[in-house]
Every structure is written in C-alpha cells, then in structure tokens.
Regions:
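Aromatic pocket-lining residues of Rossmann-like dinucleotide-binding sites
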Residues: 1
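Residues at the starts of beta-strands that form the adenosine-phosphate
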Residues: 6-7
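The conserved SAM/SAH-binding core of class I Rossmann-like methyltransferase domains
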Residues: 11
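Rossmann-like adenosine-cofactor binding region
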Residues: 15-114
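C-terminal helix-to-coil terminal segments
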Residues: 17, 107-163
Length: 163
C-alpha cells in the first residue's frame, strides 16, 4: 500500500519498531490505531485474544474520512478473526465500503452465506498464500540444513502465545 501513497500503520500485541510503519500495541492503543486506518489488512495469528476481532465495533472505529466511500477490510489470516454477521451488516449499512475475504468462519463458505450476494464483498477460496513445490522444497531444505548444523530453527511456535 505504501507504493500507492498510503501511510502504513501496524498494530500488534507487543510494541514493534518497523521502518516506515507507525506502530501501535496492545488493547489500549487499538482504538487510536483504527481511527487513522483506511484499509485494514488482518494478518494476525488466531489466538483467544484475537478471535472475533473483526467485528462491528472494530469496523465502526475505522477512519471515516479517508477513502472515498469509506474504509475497506481485508482478511487473509483466519476465519475465526471475523464475525460474518457483523461484516454483512457493515457492508450493507455503509460502515464498510468493501471487504476482501480469503478465510471464513466455516470453510468452504456455505452456498447460502449472504456474503456471496454482496457486490462489495470480494471472495477468494483461501489462497492468499499460494506456494509452489519449488519454494516448499527450498524452504524445507533450508530448515533441514539449519537443524543439521545445530543452528536455530525458523518460525517455531511459542505454545504459550499460541503462535
């Protein structure tokens, strides 16, 4: 989004310093983060704390005077983050201009879901992060080499945090 002139803002559980990104952290800064956000891209891990975070209250907190027609939500993380009834409400009452959803509370998205009928809801079949066999093998080989060399393994799950 930066190449299109959008300022970048990020929110996480703990403070982070990322060059070119205005950072917000913790529950206390969530509302301030939303107030300046036109396009909300969710890539959070799904934990008990983030389940249902994409809800009507969150959508109402997004910046109202930025994008023509209102804010946009993109969820490419986990379906458990969103409350689809709240998405339908926000997309039909104008709280959200649009949504792009790659994940759903129930997958595949049921044929009778009202999301299918909304012209401002763009649906993809859980393919936001497609991998090729070549990239998969290259990554796996890198992990094996690191393990054999006694080095640290990448992307280990912290079971206490849930991701």
């Amino acid at each position: 989004l930066k190449v299109f002139g959008f300022p970048l803002r990020g929110w996480s559980r703990t403070p982070k310093a990322i060059e070119g990104v205005e950072g917000f952290a913790g529950e206390a800064q969530f509302a301030d983060f939303l107030k300046g956000t036109d396009i909300l891209v969710n890539l959070l891990p799904l934990t008990p704390e983030t389940a249902g975070i994409l809800n009507y209250q969150t959508f109402r907190g997004l910046r109202r005077d930025g994008l023509d027609g209102g804010p946009v939500v993109i969820n490419a993380a986990r379906g458990g983050h969103q409350r689809e009834a709240d998405l339908v409400r926000a997309l039909t009452d104008g709280t959200l201009r649009a949504a792009s959803l790659d994940v759903f509370e129930v997958e595949p998205l049921p044929q009778d879901s009202p999301l299918w009928a909304l012209p401002n809801c763009f649906i993809t079949p859980h393919i936001a992060a497609a991998s090729t066999e070549t990239t998969g093998v290259a990554y796996f080989s890198k992990v094996i080499r690191a393990h054999e060399a006694g080095g640290p393994l990448p992307n280990l799950v912290d079971v206490q945090r849930g991701y």
